Amino acid sequence: MAKAPMRVAVTGAAGQIGYSLLFRIANGDMLGKDQPVILQLLDLPQAQAAVKGVVMELEDCAFPLLAGVVITDDPKVAFKDADVALLVGARPRSKGMERKDLLEANAQIFTVQGKALDEVASRNVKVLVVGNPANTNAYIAMKSAPSLPRENFTAMLRLDHNRALSQIAAKTGKPVASIEKMFVWGNHSPTMYADYRYATVDGKSVKDMINDPVWNNDVFLPTVGKRGAAIIEARGLSSAASAANAAIDHVHDWVLGTNGKVVTMGIPSNGEYGIPADTMFGYPVTCANGKYEIVKGLEIDAYSQEKINITLNELEEEKAGVQHLLG
């Protein structure tokens, strides 16, 4: 028997990431090749014509799984009964804009969206915040939606995770799919800490294979952390297709499970690994039955603790910067 369609809300639908994302969702890459979807697309009033153009293209693909499309500039329409919400749209940093101003501008957007989700979304909605600063935006949305379970709100660390995987694959000369138990701690920012101390390839330790702390500290971590800036430098535009791909990976694994594989998700802490509760933090997780679970019992050495503290301090500063807006 055919499955009932799932409602997928996407904000910033007319943007670059949206354009890379929507066709793959409609093709079944995110929720499975047997799962019909209804896309509920949100963007600003001035972007509605552009969204209509994207929808014309979606129609022209004749995707068998695309059961319907809603176009709106009203969050309460976009999030109505949503099973999955991808919050992609965010205020980008303009020239001369202080980080504080960026945080405040986005806090307003994500407060409104959190409240709308709280009012109209499915009680089981899975929310992924892609728009930057993703961790803090996810925290704001979560805090603005008190009637939804806090674990329904997540931030995207999967792009950092995938970037780190590809760097390790290149360094070891091994296929990217053979690398297991590599993950990322912290904020989706250059302070994130990609950790391969437990990673293996075909059962062999990646740390032993690479055996180069200088490469780890001076090449690997900066390359992964500043990859977004390097892409803007090279392409003149920010990474859109790779961000969309990471969003697909994140939701796919959350909904359909990881089969024991460890991945990275930004999730609200319950105090695990000494991270203050409610902090939206990148953790190693496994997913099964539509739920994620933090990998427990990992030893944190002094170097790793130092790196985790740096990214945590940045997140705490961001959180403090928006606290007054949350009432």
Swiss-Prot record:
Looking at the keywords, is Oxidoreductase present?
Answer: yes
Q: Binding of NAD(+): at which residues?
A: 12-18, 106, 113, 130-132
- Any idea which positions bind substrate? 93, 99, 132, 163
UniProt catalytic activity: (S)-malate + NAD(+) = oxaloacetate + NADH + H(+)
Superkingdom to which the source organism belongs: Bacteria
Q: Which InterPro entries match?
A: L-lactate/malate_DH (IPR001557), Lactate/malate_DH_C (IPR022383), Lactate/malate_DH_N (IPR001236), Lactate_DH/Glyco_Ohase_4_C (IPR015955), Malate_DH_type2 (IPR010945), NAD(P)-bd_dom_sf (IPR036291)
- Which Enzyme Commission numbers does its entry carry? 1.1.1.37
First-tier enzyme category under EC: oxidoreductase
Sorted alphabetically, the keyword list is: NAD, Oxidoreductase, Tricarboxylic acid cycle
Location of the active site: 188 (proton acceptor)
> What PANTHER family does the record tag this protein with?
MALATE DEHYDROGENASE
Summarizing the function annotation, the protein's role is:
Catalyzes the reversible oxidation of malate to oxaloacetate.
What is the name attached to this protein's record?
Answer: Malate dehydrogenase
Gene name in the database record: mdh
